[in-house]
Regions:
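Generic protein-terminus/edge-of-domain signal
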Residues: 1-76
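N-terminal regulatory/effector-sensing and dimerization cores
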Residues: 49-122
Length: 122
């Protein structure tokens, strides 16, 4: 991955800054309509869109949840730790994880150097 793109991905987003400032939980309204247990594609994909790409939010644990879309995570730098149906899986730079719809999982807190890219697809 080109350093320029990696530098862009390492910028701390507005959402991530809130976590660094002490907001303990993920911003539910960004991901779910009701409870964080199901992440809703309608909040992440624009109407008519079949796929989107976004960086994984760092500095916060993502609690156990499922999606109504397919998620592909690419680890661009560092590592990401997922707990998938009770089993821990550590992904490292260059690894790709594909999760089908409704797979129950959680993601441990990623630090500054841990860069994951989420591909969200119907």
């Amino acid at each position: 991955m080109k350093q320029k793109l990696l530098d862009e991905l390492m910028r701390v987003s507005e959402e991530e800054q809130k976590y660094l400032d002490g907001q303990g939980d993920i911003e539910k309204q960004l991901y779910a309509k009701e409870k964080i247990g199901e992440i809703d594609r309608e909040l992440l994909l624009k109407r008519g869109q079949l796929i989107t790409v976004r960086p994984h939010s760092r500095f916060v644990d993502f609690p156990e949840h499922r999606h109504n879309y397919v998620e592909i995570m690419y680890v661009a730098q560092g590592s990401m730790t997922h707990c998938i149906e009770g089993k821990e899986l550590v992904l490292h730079k260059g690894d790709v994880l594909m999760l089908n719809q409704q797979v129950v999982h959680s993601i441990k807190r990623a630090d500054y150097q841990d860069i994951g890219i989420n591909f969200i697809a119907l």
